[in-house]
Amino acid sequence: SAEVAGAIIDGASLTFDVLQTVLKALGDVSRKIAVGIDNEPGMTWTAMNTYFRSGTSDVILPHTVPHSKALLYDGQKNRGPVTTGVVGVIAYAMSDGNTLAVLFSIPFDYNLYSNWWNVKVYKGHRRADQAMYEELYYDFSPFRGDNGWHTKSIGYGLKGRGFMNSSGKAILQIHVNKV
């Protein structure tokens, strides 16, 4: 099955069932996420990097995402008895010369924190790092993982439509398209 983290699938095939399959493959981890990002605006995306504020992934970020395809990725808290969640930013260079950035945040302690996500286009090519994480988390109106769909302009004539649940076993589905 192509429904594994690190795979590229047809954008039209990006469903919650696919993301649940990716999530199950991570096994019994208390904080984990399956990410699916659909490339609909007619560009090619090339992987730059993932910055993890906490947590990790055993999967290599899919390198090239053609138009009408979706990437699958995952993340999990660090192994062992550590009190961390999985928080990070994915960066893709887009063929228009800009960078697509996607934030995901699955906390360890739900008494203090909630799930959050964000998507934004940065001018030029920029790798994900701590500064990008802080901008996406604190400054650019992230969405709470509230089991609902949200849409916003993400810059440079593009919009992002996404969904994240509120669970520690999270799914994040984002569709990037022209405005």
Swiss-Prot record:
Binding site residues for an N-(acyl)-sphingosylphosphocholine 4: 133, 138
Span(s) of short sequence motif Cell attachment site, crucial for protein stability: 144-146
Chain spans, region Trp-rich region, which is important for the binding to lipid membrane: 105-120
Entry keyword annotation includes Nucleotide-binding: no
Key words of the record: Cytolysis, Ion transport, Lipid-binding, Membrane, Nematocyst, Secreted, Target cell membrane, Target membrane, Toxin, Transmembrane, Transport
Annotated spans, N-terminal alpha-helix that contributes to the pore: 1-29
Site description Part of the hydrophobic cavity (in subunit A) that receives Val-60 from the adjacent subunit (B), residues in chain: 16, 149, 163
Thermal profile of function: Stable up to about 62 degrees Celsius.
Region (N-terminal region), start-end ranges: 11-30
Chief location: secreted
InterPro entries, sorted: Actinoporin_PFT, Anemon_actinoporin-like, Cytolysin/lectin
Membrane-crossing segments per the record: none
Note: This protein has been found to bind carbohydrates, since it shows a substantial delay in elution profile in size-exclusion chromatography. The carbohydrate pocket ovelaps with the lipid-binding module of actinoporins.
Subunit structure: Octamer or nonamer in membranes. Monomer in the soluble state.
Function: Pore-forming toxin (PFT) that consists of a crown-shaped octamer or nonamer that forms cation-selective hydrophilic pores of about 1.5 nm (inside) and 13 nm (outside) and causes cytolysis. It causes cardiac stimulation. Also causes hemolysis (HC(50)=0.3 nM). Interestingly, the Phe-16 is crucial for hemolysis.
Name listed for the protein in its UniProt record: DELTA-actitoxin-Afr1c
